Amino acid sequence: NTIKANLLMKNITKYKIEKDKKLFKEKINLFNEKNFTPADYNKTKVIFILGMPRSGTSLVEQIVSSHHAVFGGGELSYLNLLVNEKITNNSEIFYKSNNIFNNLQKEYMSMMSNKNKNFLNFTDKSPLNFRWIGFIINMFPNSKIIHCKRNKIDVCWSNFKNKFEGALNFSNDLQDLKKYYQLYENLMQFWEKKFPNKIYNLEHEELINNSEKTIKNLINFCNLDWDKNCLKHHENKRAIKTVSFIQARKPIYKEKVKNSFLYDKYLDELK
C-alpha cells in the first residue's frame, strides 16, 4: 500500500518542509540583494533540463541528446555539490570573491571532462537544479535552461507513488508535496522575473499532444540545427538511470497525459 509505505518513510526521514522553505527564501533574498559579475563565456554549451521530479525531464533529455551534436550527461550531481560546498558552506568567501563564478565554472567543467571529451553541447538533467538557476546563469552565461512543466496533480501524484533516494523526502506526504510544489512555483516565478528570456518553459502536455512542433521549437531554442533523430528519441541507446527510463525509451503517447484522474478521490489533499 503506497500510503502506508510513504507514512513509514516520512516517520523514518523526519522530513520537515521548513528546511526547504528556508533554503528557497535564502536564494530569493540572495539574488534580490546582489547583482553578480557572471563568468566568462564557455565554449562548451551546457543545456540544463530541470523542473519538478517526474515532470518529463528524462524524456526531454532523451529527445535533446538524440541530436548528433549533443552529449547526454544524465542526472549529474556536480552543480549541487558546488553550490553546497563552495557557496552555502563558505558564504563569506563567496561574497568576497570577484572570480567566484569563473572558478565554479572551471570546477564544474573539470568534473564533466571525465564524462564528455568530444562534444561542444551536453545536457545536465538534474530536476532539482531549478533551485540553483541564479547560479547557473552566472556560471554559464551561454547555457540553455529548459524548464519542464507538468500538470500539478499529475506531477505530485507521480512523485508520491514513485520512490526516490536522497533529497526527495518531501514526496512521502501529500501535504508536504502540495507545499513543496508551491515553493517550486514561487521560486520559478522569481527566476523568470529576475532573468527574463533566459528560461524556456516546456509544457509536458504540449509535448505529448503536439510533439513535432514542440520538439522543433525546443531544438531551435538550444541554437542547434534541426536533426530528425530528435523525433526518434526512443531509438537512442544511451543509458538512462532514472525511474522514467521505460517511458523515455518509448514513442510519445497521448494517454500519458493526466493519468492521475484515475486516483482523483485520493488526491483531495493536493487540490
Where do the protein language model's features map onto the residues?
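Conformational gate/switch positions in structured elements
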Residues: 57-58, 152, 211
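Conserved nucleotide-binding/hydrolysis micro-motifs of P-loop NTPases
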Residues: 77-79, 150-155, 207-208
